[in-house]
Amino acid sequence: DPKTGVWAECPGYSNVVLNDYTSFATLFDRNLNYDLVKAMPVLSKAVAATPQYLFPNRMICGFGDTHPGYLNTNPISRMIRNAQHNGKKEQEEYFTAMLKCFHPDAGKTKDNKKSVPVSINSFFDEKPLELNPNIEAGKIEQYVSPFFYAPNVSWLVQRNGMNPRNSLMISLNASEGNHMHANGISMELYGKGYVLAPDAGIGLYLYSGLDYLEYYSQFPSHNTVCVDGISSYPVMKSNHSFDLKSSFPVSSEPGKAFTSVTYS
């Protein structure tokens, strides 16, 4: 989405797509000296938007075919590589601070040049990332919004802070986009350090357990699996979104001051 940077799938698949896009852009830039991030600025916007998926405990929302986990920071690293390769200081500062926030050990010993194995792949793989030591880690509040709404996946978030213990949050999702399922509205709550009523996501056994089969209307069947020889799209990629009539606060820009009350 050019306005929000959110890919039109659930968080689990969105992060995979973003990882692949940024990986290709890095490869393209390094070997052909063509800046795809400049040509497609929505890429950097998409990377900057990924923290919006986070609960105050730093784990991502689990709606749709998603397994809750932590943020993949590889796309952030690649935005830094892109900035360094093309002399974009402002972009380097922004994403370096973000990377140090979500991955404090990035660029340290395990990423050191000495740890790179001697291999033919070293001619093609990404080289160890060197971070500017003068750039300090950002604060997580700089990268999330008190209120965030992505209509292309019919998903909104309200939060009053990012304190793992004391902050509250709600993640509300209908069914719009891919891997979302047409079985109503998903609502995940957060309080006292816990995700309350977490979405079942892809289930305990990654699509193959009864918890997945009995929660959703069918197994995934438009991707690589055909159930009873029939593959159907309407259940997995549906168009059953909710309409956001009003909200407070209005702005969804990250870094805005949190309010004690939010409304939608």
Task: Describe these PLM feature segments.
Residues 8-264:
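Extended polysaccharide-engagement surfaces of secreted carbohydrate-active enzymes
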